[in-house]
Amino acid sequence: RGKIAQSMGYRVKEFFHKYFYEAAYPLKKYSRNIFWESMTQNTEKVKNLSKNFAINSQHQIIPDKNPVTLFSQNPIRIFRIFAWVSEKNYYLSYPIIRSIEDHVDQMCPIFINKDDQKEVQLCFKRVINGKYFSKSLRLLHEFGLLANFYIPEFKNICGLLQDIYVHHFPTDIHVLSALDILNGLEIDEDTDPFLRNLYHSIRDKTTLKLSVLLHDIGKGIRSPGQNEELLGARLVPEILQHLGY
């Protein structure tokens, strides 16, 4: 890895960020979109979620109206989708994916009034409280909403390389992977029975989930010699307030 980075004129950390976030990650999205463009979309609804969204036979969320105008008229609707994913383990249909990608730039706090801001915060709480929270948080991260809207401090840990002898992933992916493991204690019956029972013995799991989500947030602003845990602890109160806690 180091030799490849050096041959291309980068240090390892710079190379990884350039390669993964500006090449590999976008390639994944474009490849997915090309694949879906070649498929016939399942538009037959089997269940209504709201007056604007429904579910098809593949458990995908589909628009019940023109997706082009659906989000352009009310971008807040995007956040409800991730709440449904977390609560019911639904999937995103291709029209929904493209519509989110086309309108994600409208997802900026300065464009949202106070009443809508409260609804957006409620949607995040529904994501955290949902049974499939890690899946939904990954999607929020993939579309850029986790860092660009909910937790701006998350930008600083995106692609941030860590000690390769302990961590296999950059910091943001490491956090999401940790959330996957935590979520597995809730939905996977084959996980360690002791840990599973310990997890289910916790009455309110919100604090635990948020702790895992934010446990490395201090790494993004750390300078040499600084304690990342203390830095993160100072950031957390303001982050939680922004999230509506």
Label the predicted regions.
Residues 51-61, 142-159, 170-212, 217-218, ...:
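Active-site-adjacent "gating/activation" loops or surface patches in catalytic cores
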Residues 1-32, 170, 195-245:
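Divalent metal-dependent catalytic cores for phosphoryl transfer on phosphate-bearing substrates
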Residues 1-165:
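Non-catalytic interface/linker regions that flank or bridge core catalytic/transmembrane domains
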